[in-house]
């Protein structure tokens, strides 16, 4: 008993529980239990334990807790066990993540899709310079995300692929809204510039605004607000005054003074109103010129209600312009017959005047006044008959006056100057500025007049002087010898020589006649020259030029003849001058012949009282 009562055996007392915790082989038995089972206070050793036993389990508990926590973490990471109520305490390792997420919740993010905007607008928005400008202006960061996709590519889009869009991120909603509004303004300007007469293919850019880490559900309500603002409805109203009068400025009437009418519609409805088409002055960016369509008003608005209101105001404006044009046309119709101006032709009508007028879109209710053709000036009929008279030009007062615009009559060929038609035998002695002989009568005078206009065509100048036999002619020499007018030239020497031979016999006859009659008559001399002209038909062209010059010399002869006096010297001089005047020309009247020829002619001319 003593043994059992005096000394305790180790088998008599239970083993300390701490020994099981220190053994690593016992740990798998704890796995089916919860993670906090081995941390519960009931597992503590009993109070009867010694101090040594208490100190040993305290160090073992810390080690066991660390190992258990590591194992539990590994199991939860693999998903074999689910976290319990103690899990928030266990996830204290990424404890700073919630604070970081909370700071990110303050950033507002918006996405503006620009995949379907016009090319020029898309290129402008994707430029870094434009995005930097938007960032400086709004305070939000703008970047390009996604890639451009066509309609076919968008239909086959993958889960991780998105169309081209702009990523806007800011600290507050106001900064993001400011950047988005700027982007919308750029897109609106690009759409308006690229709009054409056909229906637009741009459906608008979608804008998505959300908080980055937040779920999609709370962000859905503001999304339609931004998306609806970018969907533009468009319409156009044709003016309908393509064939208006050129003096009626349709563009100015529609736009108003300084585009005030269209600006008023924009302020009232908030729509974009522009004038486009032919004559609008709006240059299309694609073609670089005006559209081929007739003039129309282009209307664009984000909402259909605003578009309808703007369209109604534009219709009222066009009605006012049409009524004003009708008043303008009526005013022209009432004033045109009074002033006598011709109006432009109707639509599809052939103009009655050679002037071109643009086709008009109205019907003129009055007869078109055609300007009368200018009446031709009254032509004074006159007939140029064969004149019989002096070749001297008539007085200016005698020539019949005619109207200035009268054109020459092609049926009556005339020559200018037209000689004065006078009765036979009439003369104009008042026009004699030189000692000419009075005009002869009859056939000889007619031949002179008809050939007078041809003198200017046959005049020739030479430095040679033909030899002549009548060297006894005396008179005044007109001008130098080398510039003397020789008429038709040297072929005339044959006639001159023949006439000179005949003049010798005539001088003898006249000398015999002078003894009986004093003074000798001058007319028989000219009468005797007519047979001489007829006797030389081979020189018809030569004889046509001489009669005028013979008349000049004859005039000089009568001017030198003295009718009173009985001096034989005067008779001799008279005979010499008479023979020279009847045969010589005006160009050799004063030529001095050699002394040998003068002596030969002086022999038959001695006075009658010295005759043997």
Curated annotation (Swiss-Prot):
Annotated segments matching region Disordered: 510-542, 565-612
Domain KH: start-end pairs: 105-185, 237-319
One cellular-component annotation, GO: nucleus
Subcellular localization(s) per the UniProt record: Nucleus; Cytoplasm
One GO biological process term: mRNA splice site recognition
Chief site of localization: nucleus
Annotated segments matching region Required for nuclear retention: 477-545
GO MF terms held by the record: RNA binding
Keywords: Cytoplasm, mRNA processing, mRNA splicing, Nucleus, Phosphoprotein, RNA-binding
Record-linked Pfam families: KH-I_KHDC4-BBP, KH_12
UniProt superkingdom: Eukaryota
Function, in words: RNA-binding protein involved in pre-mRNA splicing. Interacts with the PRP19C/Prp19 complex/NTC/Nineteen complex which is part of the spliceosome. Involved in regulating splice site selection. Binds preferentially RNA with A/C rich sequences and poly-C stretches.
Family (UniProt): Belongs to the KHDC4 family.
Domain notes: The C-terminal part is necessary for the interaction with the PRP19C/Prp19 complex/NTC/Nineteen complex. The KH domains mediate RNA-binding.
Quaternary data: Interacts with PRPF19.
Protein name: KH homology domain-containing protein 4
Organism: Xenopus tropicalis (Western clawed frog)
Phylogenetic lineage: Eukaryota, Metazoa, Chordata, Craniata, Vertebrata
Gene this protein is translated from: khdc4
């Amino acid at each position: 008993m003593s043994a059992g009562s005096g000394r305790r055996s180790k088998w008599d007392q239970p083993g300390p529980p701490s020994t099981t915790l220190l053994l690593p082989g016992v740990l798998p038995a704890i796995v089916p239990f919860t993670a906090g089972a081995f941390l519960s206070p009931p597992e503590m050793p009993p109070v009867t334990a010694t101090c040594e036993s208490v100190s040993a389990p305290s160090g073992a508990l810390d080690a066991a807790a660390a190992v258990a926590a590591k194992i539990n973490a590994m199991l939860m990471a693999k998903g074999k066990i689910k976290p319990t109520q103690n899990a928030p305490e266990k996830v204290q390792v990424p404890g700073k993540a919630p604070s970081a997420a909370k700071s990110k919740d303050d950033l507002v993010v918006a996405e503006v899709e620009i995949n379907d905007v016009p090319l020029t607008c898309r290129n402008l928005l994707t430029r870094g310079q434009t995005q930097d400008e938007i960032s400086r202006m709004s305070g939000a960061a703008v970047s390009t995300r996604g890639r451009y996709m066509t309609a076919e590519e968008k239909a086959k889009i993958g889960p991780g692929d998105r169309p081209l869009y702009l990523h806007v991120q800011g600290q507050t909603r106001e900064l993001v809204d400011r950047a988005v509004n700027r982007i919308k303004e750029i897109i609106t300007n690009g759409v308006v510039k690229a709009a054409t007469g056909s229906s637009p293919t741009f459906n608008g850019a979608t804008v998505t605004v959300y908080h980055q880490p937040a779920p999609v559900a709370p962000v859905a309500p503001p999304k339609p607000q931004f998306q609806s603002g970018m969907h533009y409805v468009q319409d156009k109203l044709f003016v309908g005054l393509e064939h208006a009068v050129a003096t009626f400025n349709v563009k100015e009437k529609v736009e108003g003074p300084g585009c005030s009418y269209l600006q008023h519609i924009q302020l009232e409805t908030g729509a974009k109103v522009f004038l486009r088409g032919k004559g609008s002055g709006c240059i299309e960016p694609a073609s670089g010129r005006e559209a081929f369509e007739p003039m129309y008003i282009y209307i664009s608005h984000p909402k259909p209600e605003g578009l309808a209101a703007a369209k109604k105001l534009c219709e009222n404006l066009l009605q006012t312009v049409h009524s004003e044009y009708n008043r303008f046309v009526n005013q022209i119709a009432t004033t045109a017959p009074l002033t006598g101006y011709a109006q432009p032709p109707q639509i599809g009508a052939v103009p009655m005047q050679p002037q071109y007028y643009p086709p008009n879109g109205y019907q003129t209710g009055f007869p078109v006044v055609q300007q009368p053709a200018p009446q031709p000036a009254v032509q004074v009929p006159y007939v140029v008959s064969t004149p019989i008279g002096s070749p001297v030009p008539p007085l200016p007062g005698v020539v019949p006056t005619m109207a200035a615009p009268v054109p020459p009559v092609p049926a009556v060929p005339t020559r200018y100057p037209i000689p004065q038609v006078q009765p036979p035998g009439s003369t104009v002695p008042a026009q004699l500025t030189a000692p000419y002989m009075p005009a002869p009568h009859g056939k000889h005078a007619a031949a002179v007049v008809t050939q007078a206009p041809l003198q200017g065509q046959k005049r020739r100048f030479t430095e040679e002087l033909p030899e002549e036999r009548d060297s006894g002619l005396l008179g005044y020499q007109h001008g130098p010898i080398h510039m003397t007018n020789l008429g038709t030239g040297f072929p005339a020497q044959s006639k001159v020589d023949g006439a000179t031979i005949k003049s010798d016999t005539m001088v003898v006859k006249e000398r015999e006649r002078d003894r009986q009659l004093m003074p000798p008559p001058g007319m028989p001399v000219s009468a005797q020259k007519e047979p001489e002209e007829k006797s030389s038909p081979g020189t018809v062209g030569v004889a046509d030029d001489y009669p005028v010059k013979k008349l000049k010399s004859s005039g000089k002869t009568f001017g030198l003849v003295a009718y009173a006096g009985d001096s034989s010297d005067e008779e001799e001089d008279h005979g010499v001058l008479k023979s020279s005047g009847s045969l010589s020309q005006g160009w050799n009247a004063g030529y001095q012949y050699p002394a040998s020829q003068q002596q030969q002619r002086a022999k038959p001319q001695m006075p009658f009282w010295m005759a043997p």
